[in-house]
């Protein structure tokens, strides 16, 4: 948006040091203000049929967001649930799949394979900031986060080449350095509600906005209904066309680029959940 490139800082240490000192002074004097976010599009699939909107902050905003994330991540780590695996230190998809297998082996063979509609784009600012304020009391930090969330979006018209500026009333832009952390935070209450406070004792495994609820036979439909209500109360939407209830004993399902099926051991004759990369991955 401002035409400043990170390569400018990389080339010249003296320029970089002066730039960082000036930025530190802006933060100290509280004169720093977030800049508009540049909207770009990338293809979501190899067939190039669907596009995903990204919001790219300026270099200055990325640096400040990165510094804030370094400070805030350990604070919120204390609240994040053990079954949440995305954007966290020393966690990856294979650990999430191990938790899925563990739940299946415990008899939770009915799966709510949930799809959230445009999750990053729909996160309501007011409710998210309320969640942030539970742990962060520093008004300056709260104002920074509010400013990043509400930064206008700049998009170049592909036909005319003219810039269009629109206000950002909800969502946290995919492409922002702090966005994954905020997106994780907003679903933390759901992690605890399903895993710790639900009388059916299901297991929910979440990787950002990809999630599964694994339950005993006969419990999945009710849990899917409750999930929909929980999301609606927080101004989020369940994509009902893509969300499905799976009896894993009868059909396979995909999660995080893996296909899960039940197989029988050749020697032991015992059934076990088999995980392998999907064709799409």
Tell me what each language-model feature is.
Residues 51-58, 269-272:
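Conserved phosphate-binding loops in nucleotide/dinucleotide-binding enzymes
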Residues 17-44:
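Heme-based O2/NO sensor domains and their adjacent alpha-helical segments
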Residues 264-281:
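Basic, alpha-helical interaction scaffolds
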